[in-house]
């Protein structure tokens, strides 16, 4: 039986070098465009974790006040209340991105601070340290950006 179409010789299939380089160039452009957005999202996520850790530390301070009727220790030589181990860093497990501490306390007030770990992923963050006081007033230190930008 005769074929109506003559058979072409079998051609090797695969990718040419030009096609591979084109794909690599497209992937490089996509990575260059998407990485800054990813890094911004990651910083926001770490900052949100630190904000949640500050709220947890604030609840701890409220429980301390309920038990002792004051936010400080009552000892003039060591007035600041130390936060227990799970509350003194953000995230609670793994490598710390922020250190959570009581930076000011007296009988009727306190200020909590979330300070980026030096040489950590949040060290170059423009928001600097996040603060929270007994009235849940939010603040930032060591930066020129607004509180609203950092406490989203």
Residue spans for each PLM region:
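Periplasmic/extracellular, small/polar-rich flexible segments of pilin-like filament-forming proteins
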Residues: 2, 66-152
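N-terminal secretory signal peptides that target proteins for export/translocation
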Residues: 1-10
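Phosphate-coordinating loops and pocket residues in cytosolic domains that bind phosphorylated ligands
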Residues: 35, 40, 73-76
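Residues at secondary-structure transition points
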Residues: 12, 41-48, 52, 105, ...
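N-terminal single-pass transmembrane signal-anchor helix
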Residues: 10-38
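Membrane-proximal N-terminal amphipathic helix
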Residues: 42-70
């Amino acid at each position: 039986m005769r074929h109506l179409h003559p058979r072409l010789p079998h051609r090797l299939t695969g990718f040419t070098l030009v096609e591979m380089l084109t794909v690599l160039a497209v992937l490089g452009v996509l990575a260059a465009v998407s990485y800054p957005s990813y890094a911004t999202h990651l910083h926001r996520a770490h900052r949100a974790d630190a904000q949640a850790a500050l709220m947890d530390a604030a609840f701890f301070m409220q429980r301390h006040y309920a038990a002792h009727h004051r936010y400080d220790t009552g000892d003039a030589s060591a007035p600041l209340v130390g936060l227990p181990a799970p509350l003194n860093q953000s995230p609670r497990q793994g490598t710390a991105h922020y250190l959570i501490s009581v930076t000011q306390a007296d009988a009727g007030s306190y200020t909590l601070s979330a300070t980026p770990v030096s040489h950590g992923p949040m060290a170059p963050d423009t928001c600097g340290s996040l603060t929270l006081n007994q009235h849940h007033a939010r603040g930032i230190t060591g930066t020129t950006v607004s509180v609203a930008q950092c406490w989203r």
